[in-house]
UniProtKB/Swiss-Prot annotation:
It comes from Pelodictyon phaeoclathratiforme (strain DSM 5477 / BU-1). Keywords: Calvin cycle, Carbohydrate metabolism, Cytoplasm, Hydrolase, Magnesium, Metal-binding. Pathway: Carbohydrate biosynthesis; Calvin cycle. NCBIfam families: PRK09293.1-1. The lineage of its organism: Bacteria, Pseudomonadati, Chlorobiota, Chlorobiia, Chlorobiales. Homotetramer. Its EC number is 3.1.3.11. This is Fructose-1,6-bisphosphatase class 1. Substrate binds at D116, G117, S118, S119, N209, Y242, K272.
Length: 333
């Protein structure tokens, strides 16, 4: 980071790939980066203020809402919505779409998970924000609707995530490579730290919640048994790395190589992760870094969303490792 490239400067340089955007993309991503700074400020001091624990309510997913979840959601909506650059938004925490007060001038839709892995915040484990940006289908922002949010993943114009951990890292793509930035609190800026991230074609790590083993189908069980067997010729056994925070598990595997698997279970036959808030943005990033992302059979970015909170299985990471998991899921092995 000796040349100190800020995220704002980097986004401006990326703007050349979008001559028709007239600077809008720069403003959109800067808005997201600003909102991330606000969330980061509270995450790092969460144990010092009354922001840990549950609110006593549940969100649209049926999950208990944590105070920091609610705070992050409100901050992102207010910080981003006030500038009028997004005509419509969707959050994992809100049942329906969100229409910002100044939406008449916005030409984009924002979908986001305000605080992924928030169940870990009480024990100081990394959490994160995931976001996805789409261009509106129509020309009138005042008529933005749910259909503008229910676009294929391949129609994203930008996607990214922010990890709040020992350091704060923001990773994003606009379809021209994947770039990571580390927050420097002394100057209040995200500085380029990981340029043109390329994920290894194969890795030695797998991330899955094996506590749900009894609920997995036979293909998933055979896959897990296979990757634990000793066979130096195929680099087995794999090592497990599972934090329970999707964005943190994904980020590690993106850099080191490996696969994250959240298969269907008897409890969640259609999968548990959200297509629009989690799978699509991470799949866009993963493919841009040379990886692969599917639901075990179909490419994530090709799935036609039917509802805002649609769920999906997810197999994402290094190409060879994802294909291996798919072969067991499909009964090829």
């Amino acid at each position: 980071m000796s040349n100190l490239i800020t995220i704002e400067r980097h986004i401006l340089e990326q703007q050349k790939f979008f001559p028709d955007a007239q600077g809008e993309l720069t403003d959109l991503l800067n808005d997201v980066a600003f909102a991330a700074k606000l969330v980061r400020r509270e995450v790092v001091r969460a144990g010092l203020v009354d922001i840990l624990g549950f609110t006593g309510s549940t969100n649209v997913q049926g999950e208990e809402v944590k105070k920091l979840d609610l705070f992050a959601n409100e901050k992102i909506i207010s910080a981003i919505g006030q500038h009028g650059r997004f005509a419509i938004m969707g959050s994992e925490e809100n049942e329906g779409v969100i229409i910002p007060p100044k939406n008449e001038s916005g030409n984009y839709a924002l979908l986001f998970d305000p605080l992924d892995g928030s169940s870990n915040i009480d024990v100081n484990v990394s959490v994160g924000t995931i976001f996805s940006i789409y261009k509106l289908k129509g020309d009138d922002p005042g008529k933005a609707s749910l259909s503008d949010c229910l676009q294929h993943g391949y129609e994203q114009v930008a996607a990214g995530y922010v990890i709040y951990g020992s350091s704060v890292v923001m990773v994003y793509t606009t379809g021209h490579g994947v770039h990571g930035f580390t927050y420097d609190p002394t100057i209040g800026e995200f500085l380029l730290s990981h340029e043109n991230i390329i994920t290894p074609k194969s890795g030695k790590y797998y991330s899955i919640n094996e506590g749900s083993y009894a609920q997995f189908n036979e293909g998933t069980k055979r896959y897990l048994d296979y990757i634990k067997e000793e066979d130096p010729a195929t680099n087995r056994p794999y090592s497990t790395r599972y934090i329970g925070s999707l964005v943190a598990d994904f980020h590690r595997n993106l850099l080191t190589g490996g696969v994250f698997v959240y298969p269907p279970t008897t409890k969640h036959l259609k999968g548990k992760l959200r297509l629009m808030y989690e799978a699509n943005p991470l799949a866009f990033i993963c493919e841009q870094a040379g990886g692969r992302a599917t639901n075990g059979r179909d490419r994530i970015l090709d799935i036609q969303p039917l509802e805002l909170h649609q769920r999906t299985p997810l197999y994402i990471g290094s190409v060879d490792d994802v294909i291996l998991a798919e072969e067991f899921e499909q009964g090829i092995r």
